[in-house]
Amino acid sequence: MPVPASLQRPAVAVTGAGADYDLLAVRFRPLFARIAEGASRREQEHELPRAEIRELIDAGFGALRVPVADGGSGASLPQLFRLLTELAAADPNLPQALRAHFAFVEDRLVSTGPQRSRWRARFVDGEIVGSSWTEVGAVPLGDVGTKVTRHAGGTDTGFSITGTKYYSTGSIFADWIDTFAQRTDNGVKVIAVVNAHQPGVTHRDDWDGFGQRTTGSGTSTFEQAHVDPENVIDFDTRFKYQTAFYQAVLLAVLAGSITAAEREVAQEVRNRTRIFSHGNASSFAADPQILQVIGQVSAAAYAADATVERAARALQLAHEGAFLGDDDEDERRNDAAELETAKAQVILSSLATHAVSDVFDALAASGVGRSKNFDRHWRNARTAANHNPWVFKARIVGDHSVNGTPPPRVWSIGAAPVGNTPPPRL
């Protein structure tokens, strides 16, 4: 039974997204609706959303941030993250699958040189970027096992890359892979942007998490794969607010997961005909206690949306700071973006996981049936919340509040150092 128009949540354009947000969003909302229709089935059958991602990209979703003059939509960061939140409400796997793409778009927007226009054209043409950064196992903290080696014969012949990465989210859908590596000739840590469609590049859809099952994460292996010289980029030149940006995509996933749970369970309550003898009304849809549960979850979705929007505004200021020519102000804005997203993460990690669990209080035993798959909302939210543990972010926020300590903007994960050796930094 479809949701009556009078009961659908209005798509309110939040202040930070601008008055023209709905004009932008209307292009994608019919597609979001189709994506939502198949989300539960895809999750249950572990069907990767290849067609859905391709349809989004063909509709211009991947070029949202590209300036209008270059063929994109010229969306602001608040607009982008509002759209990602709406997409997450349809299927939270898709924003995470495209997280690396939008981060690389952002990096190219603040970059200089001829490569910037070349990449903008690729984004407009519908090319997708994935990522391969994390290495599992005994790789020491701060080390990089994936190596980039210059081809023999001069500086213009390019490089080869060899290594194995896990958590390669989105790479299975991608044309290019944003890969964290280290050069063998000078030891510099780099981003190697690897063409995904070549010999020596393989992907395995072996991510076995209980949530976010169809993000296309898993293992990427590079065996002497070619990298063009212009696509070996010093890591130190990456956009400064990258960690905050990556986190903000997960915030959108959390916010969208609450909305998705609210919508589905509200419809379940609306359609339910059985009641309890000790309830309060002749239908679940009229029972004030059941309505209270749905209302509280709806309020959580509202708070989550507002939190994401606030973090996105801080990111927009950080983006604009890159062009001010004022290094001190640029640093201040980047620190602010990191702190804003950290605070948002601390709040939403708890808010989302509790809300998508509490929503079951509006159901009965039938609500936990596997065919309904309502539990996927909790599994998805819990999985997104477990990325980048919030407990460390809370300490960082507190250290800044008490001691004025700047937040770290780049961090790594790996095997603990031996003895009293301090952890290295990127």
Across the structure, where does each feature detected by a protein language model lie?
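Amphipathic, small/basic residue-rich leader segments at the start of a protein or domain
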Residues: M1-R99, P424-R425
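Charged, amphipathic alpha-helical oligomerization/scaffolding segments
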Residues: R27-P30, S257, E264, Q296, ...
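C-terminal helix-coil-helix/basic helical segment that borders enzyme active sites and/or dimer interfaces
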Residues: S40-E43, A303-I347, F360-L363
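Glycine-rich flavin
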Residues: R50-D58, A63-T164, T169
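Glycine-rich phosphate/pyrophosphate-binding beta-alpha loops
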Residues: Y166-S171, Y246-V249, A384-H387
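A short core secondary-structure module
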Residues: Y167-H203
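Glycine-rich beta->alpha junctions and the first turn(s) of the following alpha-helix
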Residues: G209-Y302
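Glycine-rich phosphate/cofactor-binding loops in nucleotide/flavin-utilizing enzymes
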Residues: D361-L426
